[in-house]
Design a protein with these regions (language model features):
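PDZ domains, with a preference for the canonical peptide-binding region formed by the helix
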Residues: 87-92, 306-334
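Serine-dependent protease modules
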Residues: 2-266, 271-273, 279, 319, ...
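PDZ peptide-recognition modules
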Residues: 254, 286-287, 301, 314-315, ...
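A general beta-strand register signal
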Residues: 99-100, 206, 299, 306, ...
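Conserved PDZ fold ligand-binding element
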Residues: 79-80, 290-315
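Flexible, small-residue-rich helix->loop connector segments that border functional cores
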Residues: 27, 301-304, 333
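Acidic- and glycine-rich mobile interface elements
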Residues: 125-128, 276-286, 305-308
Length: 352
């Protein structure tokens, strides 16, 4: 009797590799027409003094401030990118030049920045523009293949890198290149697909060519550790712009850390999930004065376990649950304080 299983295994493996390659190419080709390069310039005024006459004149010029990547999310030109991409220049003095993969160029209007996440929205004015399909980041699993696309290093337009989802629900402290500005990002996707400088604001794509994340940061102390904002966390921003014309976010008004086994051990509590309201020794308030959290009676050291019956844990962070509700919504909080469970209520206001 002859056995051909090893040969068949090789054929199957070759076919799987070919299928994976074809799927990757299809996904990239589907998305790239809607991936744009963003060039930010700012108009500056310089005072020139004539040494002979002492006369002063003002000269205006444009200075390039930075670049990044964005994605067109609607046929009428809404563009999603990172807040830190547009933050390099003032909103009133900046110009945003948009370059499509086809070579077409536009100047974009600034729509708004997300006050709680590293997201911003621009708009170009045209019809029938190429746009991406939004996926469902809640369905992502560790090990899933993903592709990061962006304007790498500000020079290599629409570069694509491939990897897998390495982790979900990560909480990171992200800073700009200067290190002067930092922001805590909750619930981000970790991937080993290289996210190079300039890729910020570009899409993280699954093999069906659907956007599952917005590339946002890389850990420069490690190798192949990149992060993306889940597209489902961006959907409220998109919905708000479409319905209201600006970005509206709800606010509770606390600074917190999601519980981890390490933090729970440090705090010497028996809980394994929830949002711990920070106890800050630097004078920074963890419950903002006059905020809905303040009015509810939340205190530093409290652990918010549930909001309206939704348990706070890895994928349902305090921030993500709050964003399910509009400003003015009444919410109930199940809180652990001094070994006891208490129930508090409050009304959310708008994050400004």
């Amino acid at each position: 009797m002859n056995f051909y299983a090893p040969q068949m295994t090789g054929v199957i493996a070759d076919n799987l590799r070919l299928d994976d390659q074809e799927a990757t190419i299809r996904a990239i080709n589907k998305v790239i027409p809607a991936v744009v390069s963003i060039i930010i310039t700012e108009q500056v005024t310089t005072t020139v003094i004539n040494l002979n006459t002492g006369q002063q004149t003002e000269q205006k010029s444009k200075v390039r401030k930075g670049s990044g990547t964005g994605i067109i999310i609607s046929p009428d030109g809404l563009i999603l990118t990172n807040k830190h991409v547009v933050n390099v220049a003032g909103e009133k003095t900046a110009e945003y030049r948009i370059i499509l993969n086809s070579g077409r160029q536009y100047y974009a209007q600034f729509i708004g920045k997300d006050p709680i996440n590293d997201l911003a929205v621009l708009k170009i004015f045209d019809k029938n523009l190429p746009f991406v399909q939004l996926g469902d980041s809640d369905k992502l699993q560790i090990g899933a293949t993903v592709i990061a696309i962006g304007n790498a290093l500000g020079r290599y337009q629409n570069s694509a890198t491939k990897g897998i989802v390495s982790g979900l629900g990560r909480n990171i402290e992200a800073s700009d290149q200067s290190g002067n500005t930092s922001e805590t990002l909750d619930n981000v996707i970790q991937t080993d697909a290289n996210i190079n400088l300039g890729n910020s604001g570009g899409p993280l794509v699954d093999l069906d060519g659907n956007i599952v994340g917005i590339n946002v940061a890389t850990d420069q102390t490690g190798s192949s550790i990149g992060f993306a904002i889940p597209i489902n966390d961006a959907k409220p921003v998109i919905k708000s712009v479409r319905e209201i014309g600006r970005i509206v976010r709800s606010r509770l008004g606390v600074r917190y850390h999601m519980l981890t086994p390490e933090l729970a051990s440090q705090l010497k509590i028996g809980l394994n999930s929830g949002a711990w309201i920070s106890i800050n020794n630097d004078g920074t308030p963890s419950v903002l004065d006059g905020s809905p959290a303040d009015k509810a009676g939340l205190k530093p050291g409290d652990i918010v376990m549930e909001i309206n019956g939704i348990k706070l844990q890895d994928k349902t962070t305090l921030l993500s649950v709050i964003q399910k509700y509009k400003p003015g919504a009444k919410i109930g909080l199940r809180v652990f304080r001094d070994g006891k469970i208490i129930i508090l209520t409050t009304v959310l206001d708008e994050f400004r």
